[in-house]
């Protein structure tokens, strides 16, 4: 028969074991509750399907910019001054600020072709410039260069008669066209020939005046 003292001791040994067995369950439940609340706060992980467009865009080298900005960057800039550049020294109004460069599309189209017209005018002036009897070395060089180019062009065409020395119009001893009983076409032709002779004589007189003034100033 077991005495009361032994029963008390046996019950005292069993209680700490039961408490130790219940403690891990409480800790596990508290951990589960904590992890549940924490998982609600954390954002969901990105799926491969959602990350695929961003990866493909980055690999292609495309930036997520609006379409209008992309088209503006694709256009080639005509002006050397970007929009918003302050143009110093171009203001001719009193008590006004210097102008600011505008975008290229705000300027008229004919503005970008002004230099082309000026270039054509300069080319035409260079073609008429040059005098082999000029006092300027540059003008004589231009005349010789133009004569060599003309001679090479004539030789390439095969017309050797054009290489014969030409007498200036004001030095020629020929009769001007004209008829007393001629028609309108004859009168127009005679007027054109007289105008050509008048221009040639005027050019010669100007050259002589320049030469005489230069000799007087020496």
Curated annotation (Swiss-Prot):
Pfam families: Ribosomal_L37 (PF08561). InterPro entries: Ribosomal_mL54 (IPR013870). GO terms for molecular function: structural constituent of ribosome. It is found in: Mitochondrion. It comes from the Eukaryota. Signal peptide: none annotated. GO terms for cellular component: mitochondrial large ribosomal subunit. Its main location: mitochondrion. Keywords: Mitochondrion, Ribonucleoprotein, Ribosomal protein, Transit peptide. Component of the mitochondrial ribosome (mitoribosome), a dedicated translation machinery responsible for the synthesis of mitochondrial genome-encoded proteins, including at least some of the essential transmembrane subunits of the mitochondrial respiratory chain. The mitoribosomes are attached to the mitochondrial inner membrane and translation products are cotranslationally integrated into the membrane. PANTHER family: 39S RIBOSOMAL PROTEIN L54, MITOCHONDRIAL (PTHR28595), LARGE RIBOSOMAL SUBUNIT PROTEIN ML54 (PTHR28595:SF1). Belongs to the mitochondrion-specific ribosomal protein mL54 family. Component of the mitochondrial large ribosomal subunit (mt-LSU). Mature N.crassa 74S mitochondrial ribosomes consist of a small (37S) and a large (54S) subunit. The 37S small subunit contains a 16S ribosomal RNA (16S mt-rRNA) and 32 different proteins. The 54S large subunit contains a 23S rRNA (23S mt-rRNA) and 42 different proteins. This is Large ribosomal subunit protein mL54. The gene is mrpl37.
């Amino acid at each position: 028969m077991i005495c009361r003292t032994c029963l008390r001791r046996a019950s005292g040994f069993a209680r700490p074991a039961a408490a130790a067995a219940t403690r891990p369950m409480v800790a596990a439940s508290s951990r589960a509750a904590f992890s549940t609340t924490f998982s609600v706060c954390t954002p969901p992980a990105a799926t491969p399907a959602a990350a695929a467009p961003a990866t493909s865009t980055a690999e292609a080298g495309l930036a997520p910019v609006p379409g209008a900005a992309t088209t503006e960057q694709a256009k080639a800039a005509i002006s050397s001054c970007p929009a918003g550049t302050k143009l110093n020294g171009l203001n001719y109004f009193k008590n006004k600020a210097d102008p600011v460069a505008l975008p290229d599309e705000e300027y008229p189209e004919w503005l970008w072709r002004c230099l082309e017209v000026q270039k054509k005018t300069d080319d035409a002036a260079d073609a008429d410039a040059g005098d082999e009897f000029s006092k300027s070395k540059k003008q004589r060089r231009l005349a010789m260069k133009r004569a060599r180019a003309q001679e090479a062009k004539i030789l390439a065409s095969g017309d050797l008669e054009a290489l014969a020395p030409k007498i200036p119009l004001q030095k020629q001893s020929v009769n001007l066209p004209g008829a007393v009983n001629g028609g309108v076409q004859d009168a127009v032709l005679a007027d054109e020939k007289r105008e050509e002779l008048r221009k040639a004589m005027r050019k010669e007189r100007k050259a002589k005046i320049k030469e005489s003034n230069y000799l007087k100033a020496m």
